[in-house]
Curated annotation (Swiss-Prot):
Cross-link for Isoglutamyl lysine isopeptide (Lys-Gln) (interchain with Q-Cter in protein Pup), residue positions: K11
Family from the record: Belongs to the beta-class carbonic anhydrase family.
PANTHER family referenced in this protein's UniProt entry, alphabetically: CARBONIC ANHYDRASE (PTHR11002), CARBONIC ANHYDRASE 2 (PTHR11002:SF79)
Catalytic activity: hydrogencarbonate + H(+) = CO2 + H2O
Cofactor note: Binds 1 zinc ion per subunit.
Keywords: Isopeptide bond, Lyase, Metal-binding, Ubl conjugation, Zinc
Binding site for Zn(2+): C51, D53, H104, C107
Upper lineage: Bacteria, Bacillati, Actinomycetota, Actinomycetes, Mycobacteriales
Function recorded in the entry: Catalyzes the reversible hydration of carbon dioxide to form bicarbonate.
Protein name: Carbonic anhydrase
CDD domains (UniProt xref): beta_CA_cladeC (cd03378)
The species this protein was found in: Mycolicibacterium smegmatis (strain ATCC 700084 / mc(2)155)
Length: 206
């Protein structure tokens, strides 16, 4: 998947996910020649910021290979300075045109946050920090009248998209220039489908 533009990059990922869902992956960019070609430099087309859940392996569900995607993962795709720095590196140094926020159903971080708010079950240690970072998304969702877990999961994805634009000047500049786009997506564990939830910038669809 060559370095491209947001529209072409998003199409490549959609096509790859369609192959994965159909059980017909091509497993591209995984041969000896591809591996050798990446020893000196990388030119990924997309940066995927996703949840650390072991069931949500970005390269597999988008049917991509070595050097195709720059992947950043945290539990609940929560943002901190290291995450922003990693994504900005991909955007400013590697010139990646597309940022994908990848959430999923049955998200433990969202469920833990709901339990903390509703039942006072606040986790200990650094897990508490994850819950605290997801909490604003849940509160915004409740203010909007959301009630189902899947609605809160989508809300958290959309809020993450908004936060990336608001907190990173580099990302905001790329969006303003039309050289970058951000998509918010959720992955369905049962059928493997990636669903578009929101986007900023031109990705070739409404």
């Amino acid at each position: 998947m060559p370095n491209s533009n947001p529209v072409a990059a998003w199409k490549a990922l959609k096509d790859g996910n369609a192959r994965f869902v159909a059980g017909q992956p091509l497993h591209p960019s995984q041969g000896i020649e591809r591996r050798a070609s990446l020893t000196q430099a990388q030119r990924p087309t997309a940066v995927v910021f996703g949840c650390g859940d072991s069931r949500v392996a970005a390269e597999i569900l988008f049917d991509q290979g070595l050097g195709d995607m720059f992947v950043v993962r945290t539990a609940g795709h929560v943002i901190d300075n290291a995450v922003l720095g990693s994504i900005e590196y991909a955007v400013t140094v590697l010139k990646v045109p597309l940022i994908v926020v990848l959430g999923h159903d049955s998200c433990g971080a969202v469920k833990a946050t709901l339990s903390a708010l509703d039942e006072g079950e606040v986790p200990s240690g650094f897990v508490r920090d994850i819950v605290e970072r997801v909490t604003p998304s849940i509160l915004l969702g409740r203010k909007a009248g959301l009630s189902r877990v899947d609605e809160f999961e989508a809300q958290h994805v959309n809020e993450t998209v908004a936060q990336l634009q608001m907190r990173s000047t580099a990302i905001a500049q790329g969006l303003a220039a039309g050289t970058q786009a951000i998509v918010g997506t959720t992955y369905h564990l049962a059928d493997g489908r990636v669903e578009l939830r929101s986007h900023l910038g031109d990705i070739g669809e409404v």
